[in-house]
UniProtKB/Swiss-Prot annotation:
This is Lipid-A-disaccharide synthase. The gene is lpxB. The lineage of its organism: Bacteria, Pseudomonadati, Pseudomonadota, Alphaproteobacteria, Hyphomicrobiales. It comes from Nitrobacter winogradskyi (strain ATCC 25391 / DSM 10237 / CIP 104748 / NCIMB 11846 / Nb-255). Pathway: Bacterial outer membrane biogenesis; LPS lipid A biosynthesis. Its EC number is 2.4.1.182. Belongs to the LpxB family. It is an enzyme of class 2 (transferase). Condensation of UDP-2,3-diacylglucosamine and 2,3-diacylglucosamine-1-phosphate to form lipid A disaccharide, a precursor of lipid A, a phosphorylated glycolipid that anchors the lipopolysaccharide to the outer membrane of the cell.
Length: 396
């Protein structure tokens, strides 16, 4: 591999990540780029704590944008618009070699459009595809005017972009692939997974709005489940910024869960859990890679639910189902997200039932479906970012 550090003595990369998941992606990408380009590479932009540990000084705290739901967004709209304009101005002022936008398309794509209008020669790479394959498919074609390359986390996304007339799209792999070793149990942990009483993971979401929508329903579900499995152990992984809200809320549950904080404790819980009750989202893919059968649920505000029903065009909202291309994970959405339906489904996957066996068989093939060869997702992503800079300089 050529020594980019000596061939390219100075590079400035502007990254924008406004959610925790994007912050983690950005941090891994920064590490991979620094390995390739050396210490001369400089980073500017927007990010969270993990990107800060890699040296990024964020334009503003990303917690400002951790809002979800139509009504909440409307209330914060003036602040959001101000941040979009300010971030675009900062990109132009920085004059970077490349702009990398990471997830959060409602924010990052608006910034990218503003930047492209004012600086047409700046390459723009989108790390994490918007869900154009699920809803608002016209976005794919529209992205051609302001995104030069999409880095996909899901293996079916490049084909979707070709079909929809979008920009070039390359599957680089999901960051969860780098965690398989710490997600899957060793022999002793597998024995604990199969032992009684069973351990159930409860994952109500990572945003405050999600917690509010799911926590009480999940608590009632555990109460119903405890009637048939009295000694069930319940573990609820969460993050430091949510623990103060979650801890008092679960104190009144019929079966009080053990709340664990941080990635290490979360992964340890994954390795011994027999099953999980999870809010629909990336965590379903994480559970599938860990080999944990699950029931998925999602409840949104009435306005968001009304909109979603009219625009979503996929057979399942569960990421793991979409990657596997088979609806093996039961999903209970909106009015179906009730204890009377969740508890029986959980009881079924906690036992050696056909549903549990079907999920485990499907999960066994997930590695092959998502494989990226010998290189990590962040390394593959760094390749494309570097190539975008190289092509841009060649045109100058």
């Amino acid at each position: 591999m050529p020594d980019e550090a000596s061939a390219n003595p100075s590079r400035k990369i502007f990254l924008i990540a406004t959610e925790e998941s994007g912050d983690r992606l950005g941090s891994s990408l920064m590490k991979a780029l620094r390995r390739r380009l050396g210490c001369s590479v400089r980073f500017e932009g927007v990010g969270g704590q993990t990107m800060a540990r890699e040296g990024l000084v964020s334009l503003f705290p990303i917690e400002e944008l951790s809002i979800m739901g139509f009504t909440a967004v409307v209330k914060q709209l003036p602040m959001i618009v101000r941040r979009i304009r300010g971030t675009a101005d900062a990109v132009i002022a920085a004059a970077p070699d490349v702009l990398v936008i990471i997830d959060s398309p409602d924010f990052t794509h608006r910034v990218a459009r503003r930047v492209r209008a004012r600086c047409r020669g700046l390459p723009i790479v989108d790390y994490v595809s918007p869900s154009v394959w699920a809803w608002r498919s016209g976005r794919a074609r529209a992205m051609r005017s302001y995104v030069d390359h999409v880095l996909a986390l899901l293996p079916f996304e490049p084909e979707a972009y070709r079909r929809l007339g979008g920009p070039p799209c390359t599957y680089v792999g999901h960051p969860l692939l780098e965690q398989i070793g710490v997600l899957r149990p060793d022999a002793q942990e597998r024995q604990r997974r199969d032992a009684d009483p069973p351990t159930l993971l409860v994952l109500p979401g990572s945003r405050r709005s999600e917690i509010r929508h799911h926590l009480s329903v999940f608590g009632e579900t555990i109460g119903m489940l405890q009637q048939s499995i009295p000694e069930i152990e319940v573990v609820l992984p969460t993050t430091p910024h949510l623990v103060d809200e979650i801890t008092p809320a679960v104190a009144t549950w019929p079966r009080r869960p053990r709340v664990v904080i941080g990635e290490d404790d979360k992964r340890a819980a994954f390795r011994v859990a027999r099953a999980a009750l999870a809010k629909s989202g990336t965590v379903t893919l994480e559970l599938a890679l860990a080999g944990v059968p699950m029931v998925a649920a999602y409840k949104a505000g009435s306005v968001e639910a009304w909109i979603a029903r009219r625009v979503i065009r996929v057979s399942s909202v569960i990421l793991a189902n979409l990657v596997i291309r088979e609806n093996v994970i039961p999903e209970f959405l909106q009015e179906d997200c009730v204890p009377g339906k969740l508890a029986p489904a959980l009881q079924e996957i906690l036992t050696d039932s056909p549903m549990r066996r079907r999920q485990l068989k499907a999960f066994d093939g997930l590695n092959t479906i998502m494989a990226t060869g010998q290189r990590s997702p962040s390394e593959l992503a760094a390749d494309i970012v570097i190539e975008a800079m190289r092509e841009s300089r060649a045109r100058m």
